[in-house]
Amino acid sequence: MKFKRIIKNILIGIVLLTALHTYGQQHPLYTQYYNNFSLINPAYSGSHGLFTATADIRSQWAGLVGGPETQTLSLHGPVGKNVGLGLSIVNDKVFVLNETHLFADFSYSIETSDNAILAFGLKAGGSFLNVDLLGLGIENDNLFSENINQFNPNFGAGVFYYTEKFYASLSTVNILKTKRYAKNSNVVSSASDEMVFYVSSGYVFDISEDFQLKPSVMMRAVNRSPLSADISASILWNNKLEFGISHRLDESISGLFQIRLTDNFKIGYTYDATISNLSNYNNGAHEFSFILNLGKTRKNASKIAPPFYWMKK
């Protein structure tokens, strides 16, 4: 019995280690990231000229018990001619780990010409981590006798340049490296939050009066992890309906869909089909987005909006 308990603890430790490294190496990134760009670049905050609320839901590794799930709620908008503010709440869950990120964004924009804007942004906040070791149901073992709760502050920064047709983004999150532990005194497993760098760009081509082609690329670099890249292309019809495809190198192929239901509300859906070794153990990922404009465009707001933002202003 003692030997079986040791083996069980080792297996649980391996699972915890995997989950911790999933968290430590991954900052929430949606396939339709441009719907909630301020999550990865605070310089985007306020760029719509009015306040925008966004809710995202992502279920990863569908069909696999304990697979990653993410829910996001964000709000950002202008508070002056050049200043934007934002707030985001992101909840991540995988296996017995649950983490909630709460961050505030600040941006300052400069009109470099009549049709171009350069914005700088800062992000500050922290993450609340809970490891539900008691939920494992292991009795009479001090190693799993209490849950783990941690708070880790962190910062981010970014630069965002855009015209009516083009954008380029450079940003970083997790500037402070923090360690995660699955046990206070007796460490079961640990991982680190590493600094994440994002580089992204996109362009809008006018195919006809009603159709536009929107290619984009997003690259993500994390210390001690392979470079990740999303290559996407979509077609926008009449500023109301958008559909396209995306490829995350060596990981997934995705189908994208968005529809504008009113002048100020649109919804989106994405299905990611896994092409890595995990494809035999899950049914891909589902992602839903809900975007709502609040109020009217401010009088002193810039006439230029980011090219991938196609809600009526």
Residue ranges with predicted function:
Residues 1-27, 233, 312-313:
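Bacterial Sec-dependent N-terminal signal peptides
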